[in-house]
Amino acid sequence: MPTVFPHDSVGLVTPQTAHFSEPLALACGRSLPAYDLIYETYGQLNAARSNAVLICHALSGHHHAAGFHSADDRKPGWWDSCIGPGKPIDTNTFFVVSLNNLGGCNGSTGPSSIDPDTGKPLGANFPVVTVEDWVNSQARLADLLGIDTWAAVIGGSLGGMQALQWTISYPDRVRHCLAIASAPKLSAQNIAFNEVARQAILTDPEFHGGSFQERGVIPKRGLMLARMVGHITYLSDDSMGEKFGRGLKSEKLNYDFHSVEFQVESYLRYQGEEFSGRFDANTYLLMTKALDYFDPAANFNDDLAKTFANATAKFCVMSFTTDWRFSPARSRELVDALMAARKDVCYLEIDAPQGHDAFLIPIPRYLQAFGNYMNRISL
């Protein structure tokens, strides 16, 4: 990693931690007596405090969305292609806030946090949290930072669900909502994929009912399988065919059940191995449940248009043609509801072969459209 950062990078960033001592009531009926949220900021908050943008992360995301933590970092933050000087979320214009949600495993209070009463990791004792809970905690962070209204709340996938929830829970605090590769709720198929992933973790002998940290182990096999299943759904058939096809790792087949023979097998095992070394199993369970439970229209007799009746934000919805996890049809469903509710909404369906993960990839047309929308936001 060079010590001189690219001209369009936010450069070195230092995470900050906000502590909240006021209890947070949760949708599950429990509450968190106190909690921490770790976050990063990029750019400068203007005098009018009108240029703040909130970034909401997806399932395995975190607060480190842009820049570098040290000169030795091999890779920048997970959305560095979109955040920085001259990029779609231009830090010469906007003050950007990115946090790790409650239940995460990157510094915010979650299952791997130590219970002050027992001195042990909270593990499975950490309560189930929802998208609505996250938005409520994010609103407290906004209060702490002195931000009354977000110029924009932006997210992809699960992050897009949070952006949508902001316009429902705090309609007067969001001026623009950008929901990318997202959906108004999960389909039965999506819930099914999440359940397969959860069962892989829950049935791993090293899971120990969620208390694996106390035993100094991790449910590695379960996490690997969960990630492998999930990763397949993030890619399109075309992109997998182009990248791997039926390519072999070696020149011939071994005719057994244990060898890694196809290149796609090797790739999935690598992804699972890498993920199991950096992500908490209890957090994975929580994140998938938050996805499953997101269904804001359920509180409005399943009328999605009524769900957004009080929203004052302008909406930008983007989807990708080969995304079959959150297909363009789901985005169009959202757009139709917003139009029925007479909201200001624009929609872009981007032709991209990469599948669901396309929202993380610097596709020129995507970045251009993203930037064009952000440039129209008045401060």
Swiss-Prot record:
Major enzyme class: transferase
Major location (coarse): cytoplasm
Family as reported in the entry's similarity comment: Belongs to the AB hydrolase superfamily. MetX family.
Name this polypeptide is given: Homoserine O-succinyltransferase
SUPFAM superfamilies: alpha/beta-Hydrolases
InterPro entries: AB_hydrolase_1, AB_hydrolase_fold, HAT_MetX-like
Protein task: Transfers a succinyl group from succinyl-CoA to L-homoserine, forming succinyl-L-homoserine.
Protein encoded by which gene: metXS
Residue positions binding substrate: R227, D357
Pfam families: Abhydrolase_1 (PF00561)
Localisation per UniProt entry: Cytoplasm
Record has Metal-binding as a keyword: no
Entry's Gene Ontology BP terms: homoserine metabolic process; methionine biosynthetic process
Keyword annotations: Acyltransferase, Amino-acid biosynthesis, Cytoplasm, Methionine biosynthesis, Transferase
Any GO CC annotation of this UniProt entry: cytoplasm
Catalytically driven reaction(s): L-homoserine + succinyl-CoA = O-succinyl-L-homoserine + CoA
PANTHER family: HOMOSERINE O-ACETYLTRANSFERASE
